[in-house]
Amino acid sequence: VVNQVATDKFIQDLERVAQVRSKIAVCLQKLSDTINQAELAGDTSSGKLSLERDLEDISVASKNLKKGVFRLLVLGDMKRGKSTFLNALIGENLLPSDVNPCTAVLTVLRYGAEKKVTIHFNDGKSPQTLDFQSFKYKYTIDPAEAKKLEQEKKQAFPDVDYAVVEYPLTLLEKGIEIVDSPGLNDTEARNELSLGYVNNCHAILFVMRASQPCTLGERRYLENYIKGRGLSVFFLINAWDQVKESLIDPDDVDELKASEDRLRQVFKANLTEYCYVDGQNIYDERVFELSSIQALRRRLKDSQADLTGTGFPEFMGSLNTFLTRERAIAELRQARTLARQAVNHTREAIGRRLPLLDQDVDELKKRIDSVEPEFTKLNHIRDQFQKEIFTTRDTQARKVSESFRSYVLNLGNTFETDFLRYQPELNLLDFLSNGKREAFNTALQKAFEQYITDKFAAWTLTAEKDINVAFKELSRSAFQYGASYSQVTDQITEKLTGQKVTVNPTTTTEDDKSPSWAKWAMGLLSLSRGNLAGVALAGAGFDWKNILLNYFTVVGIGGIITAVTGVFLGPIGFALLGLGVGFLQADQARKELVKTAKKELVKYLPQVAHEQSQTVYDAVKECFDAYEREVSKRINDDITARKSELDNLLKQKETREINREGELKRFKSLQEDVIAQLQNIEAAYSNLLAYYG
């Protein structure tokens, strides 16, 4: 039964979510079509209601839901058994895992009726389609070559952006997309696409190995790219079955227990801090001991095999809960909010239109003129909010770039203690023998790059926290401005119709009276257009992190490293040569190396601080500018729509006789149709919630 709960239940629950997604997407599309047809009919009757913004928003949401997938990013160092794990997860020997080859390109695994691989290039070449065998042959390399490339700072396939593998697998068909990233070393980790996926996936599956618990490379990656960034990570400790094999006496139960407990302590000590959600420790729902090879062998013999004892049932149960309950519900809730909003806007517009049908042209003009002061107030609210965004932008850009500047200038102060953990094993004789000098220089350069990368990552985390706080403040302001804005729009309605607007006091935040631009600005709605490998994620709120990411990966750290390393190695070499053969003690040489490195570093820090702090300033500024552009556009759209809704009616009245009865009937049926679509969406959403109990 446990196994049924794992694989089959996961597939069933995914299927259920896919059906609800598809149903809601269809309802949103119908809602959009209904409103659109009514708008077209308005041209020959009392004029359009100007609902363009709602039409655009719900059709984007519908498209996003139609394409909706759960994206899982698989991360892990070389030789952690990632491919074996993935093959076990999907139940087929799909990815190359024999004799340790490494997939050397970022691979996106998604559903396709035909098996095929498409390679996407980054140099303008057209994508290339391959069959499976050719892909395995052409784009995998053995670990020795991978290590060599890493040391030389080279990529195996520098012209390849990513590969898309399409495959007719049930798990993929039900809406799972798997992104397999090549490795954790810095060149790959800093790759914009990999980092982009880290920030744009539903969950990260971080594969480790029981026999190599929490290596320095893994700890550095987690510290630099995962820590404190609000990401959902599942840690999969692979090859747990090998713990037993590594014992002197594999049958000694006590020794096995002691060995496993020691390992668990190491993992717990290193991973617990990544398993807190809203202050709650959920380690047991995030860390799993797996035997992927056992699970794979069983599933290849029988896709329905019992996987008890491999760790897979527990892991899949937890992943299932996370994706089909937490994540799916959040995504569908947004769609429901948009639908409610579109229906409310339609009903409000009808409510304003009906009383005005009875007025003649002069009376209508008089009423339109009477609300001019209110429109001025709306513009004023927009300007106030815009001003606040700009003030926040300037303060943050200045503050964050200053913090970068002083951070860089202060690196020298703690360099000697900080650099210790990175320093290569130092054998001075190696350095003096020409044959090994090259290798020594390479090791030193790598150590220095790691040091800079880690320092930069630590700084970006504090910068992100500051920016996040600033956006939270703006979100609160958006709520306030939104409330004032709604009061004014209510006054407009009252003046136009001569009827009081009733306010429902018992609404939740999602359905409060906030205008839709304010909901967007508060981060309740996210309508991303899709950037990475053509798919957007329905995350919540405005995605400023991707903007920062683009700036920081492009400049960032690569720029700093190049600026400093080249000039850096020469003087260190001279300093070491100057010690002469009399000073062969490693300790003395080590001190000398750090001293010279510091001296050289300090020379270049002011230049780096000066050049790069401008980039940091621009990056932060662009985050707030992008936010302001969208907010202002949405407010302007709303003001324009409110005006044109009135102008449309006036124009129709001036040019034709409006059939009042016909309009009453048309609006009544429009209102019934949109409410019916909304009820379908509400029902689909509630049924899913009820099913999860």
Where are the predicted features?
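Alpha-helical heptad-repeat coiled-coil segments that mediate oligomerization/polymerization in large
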Residues: I350-V371, F375-L378, R382-F385, I389, ...
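Globular "head" domains of long coiled-coil molecular machines
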Residues: N36, S59, K63-I329, G566-G578, ...
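A non-catalytic, extended alpha-helical scaffold characteristic of dynamin-superfamily P-loop GTPases
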Residues: D369-F624
